């Protein structure tokens, strides 16, 4: 029989939230506003990237649809369906092609293919037949080569890593290995620092590179931040001040770090305390502005809110990466 006179824990304050914020509760915080609804269904949206004309491309992982959004009209069109299973990211090449990372069977059949904006002229860049990668994301450097993340493993089996592919797409060089589900990746404006999120161990990696872009500088691989809560850090992007924006999957928010890896702000999805719109996956800036777009979905809330793009203004304008240079 319960003793009503004993001190009793109660759900008040932070403990009332489905996803309480504890260690970052004093950060500058803003709540995002709805921008575009992609679907009434709960789709695993990912891969936000703009082309040179300012059109936004994104995808849904599990059904493989590639979407285009016109920011001026907010019109959403489905352009094509991925020829590979579980696409996870889109990056636009300077020549206009879409480079699409895919996870395959989530074990050994991931890769990257390039295609036109209509899904034509497919070219294998990293083949799922000749490798064992499970590729989640990539980022181009100014030479036209790129870094990619290998999404394999889990918390006690760190099979993933980060690799660099030369501009001719023929040579793959390991940068850092033994990572548990390497996920988001971003490159600093001077291309000297590589940021990587490690999802299932809740870690942020900051990797200082030497001039060749593949050698880690002495004492250059550090972990400046450990995240808390379920599930963990996902895709990320930088602004022109080298601040890093990291989507927190399963938490309905984006954390912002300065160039040294210190947290300086956060962006919340509406309804997150009630368990809504928690699957925040990817932030990306509208070119030439400080307006940040964030994709998320409501799958964990029985897809009640569908799949959405939200928006806020960031600390600075977005950095215009390879496709704009």
Curated annotation (Swiss-Prot):
Q: Give the cofactor note text.
A: Binds 2 Ca(2+) ions per subunit.
Which annotated residues bind Ca(2+) 2?
Answer: 108, 110, 128, 131, 133
Q: What InterPro entries does the record tag this protein with?
A: 6-blade_b-propeller_TolB-like, SGL, SMP-30/CGR1_Lactonase
Chief location of this protein? cytoplasm
Tell me the compartments it is located in: Cytoplasm
GO MF entry, a single one = hydrolase activity
Sorted alphabetically, which keywords does the UniProt record give? Calcium, Cytoplasm, Hydrolase, Metal-binding
EC numbers, comma separated: 3.1.1.-
Q: Give the cofactors, semicolon-separated.
A: Ca(2+)
Q: Which GO terms describe its cellular component?
A: cytoplasm
Annotated Ca(2+) 1 binding lies at 46, 136, 183, 234-235
UniProt KW Magnesium keyword: no
Q: Does the keyword Signal apply?
A: no
Gene3D superfamilies, per this entry? TolB, C-terminal domain
Q: Which catalytic residues are annotated?
A: 234
Q: Which PANTHER family match?
A: LACTONASE DRP35, LIPOPROTEIN-RELATED
Indicate the family of this protein.
Answer: Belongs to the SMP-30/CGR1 family.
Q: What does the record give as the function of this protein? A: Exhibits lactonase activity. Acts in cells with perturbed membrane integrity and is possibly related to the membrane homeostasis.
**What's this protein's name?**
Lactonase drp35
């Amino acid at each position: 029989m319960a003793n009503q006179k004993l001190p009793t824990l109660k759900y008040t304050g932070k403990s009332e939230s489905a996803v309480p914020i504890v260690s970052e509760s004093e950060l500058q915080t803003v709540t995002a506003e709805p921008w575009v609804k992609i679907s009434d269904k709960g789709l695993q949206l990912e891969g936000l990237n703009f082309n040179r004309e300012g059109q936004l491309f994104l995808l849904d992982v599990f059904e493989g649809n590639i979407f285009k959004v016109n920011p001026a009209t907010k019109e959403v069109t489905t352009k094509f369906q991925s020829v590979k299973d579980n696409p996870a990211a889109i990056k636009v090449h300077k020549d206009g092609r879409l480079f699409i990372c895919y996870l395959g069977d989530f074990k050994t059949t991931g890769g990257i293919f390039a295609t036109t904006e209509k899904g034509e002229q497919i070219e294998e860049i990293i083949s799922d037949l000749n490798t064992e990668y499970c590729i989640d994301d990539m980022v181009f450097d100014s030479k036209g080569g790129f870094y990619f993340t290998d999404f394999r493993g889990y918390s006690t089996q760190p099979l993933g890593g980060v690799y660099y592919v030369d501009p001719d797409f023929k040579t793959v060089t390991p940068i850092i290995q033994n990572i548990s589900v390497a996920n988001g990746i971003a490159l600093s404006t001077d291309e000297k620092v590589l940021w990587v999120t490690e999802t299932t161990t809740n870690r942020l990696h900051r990797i200082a590179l030497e001039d060749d872009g593949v050698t880690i500088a002495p004492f250059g691989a550090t972990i400046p931040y450990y995240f808390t809560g379920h599930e963990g850090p996902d895709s990320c992007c930088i602004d022109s001040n080298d601040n890093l924006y990291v989507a927190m999957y399963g938490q309905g928010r984006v954390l912002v770090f300065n160039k040294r890896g210190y947290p300086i702000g956060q962006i919340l999805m509406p309804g997150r305390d009630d368990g809504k719109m928690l699957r925040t996956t990817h932030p990306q800036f509208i070119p030439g502005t400080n307006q940040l777009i964030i994709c998320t979905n409501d799958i964990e809330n029985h897809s009640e809110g569908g799949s959405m793009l939200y928006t806020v203004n960031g600390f600075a304008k977005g950095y215009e990466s390879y496709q704009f240079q």
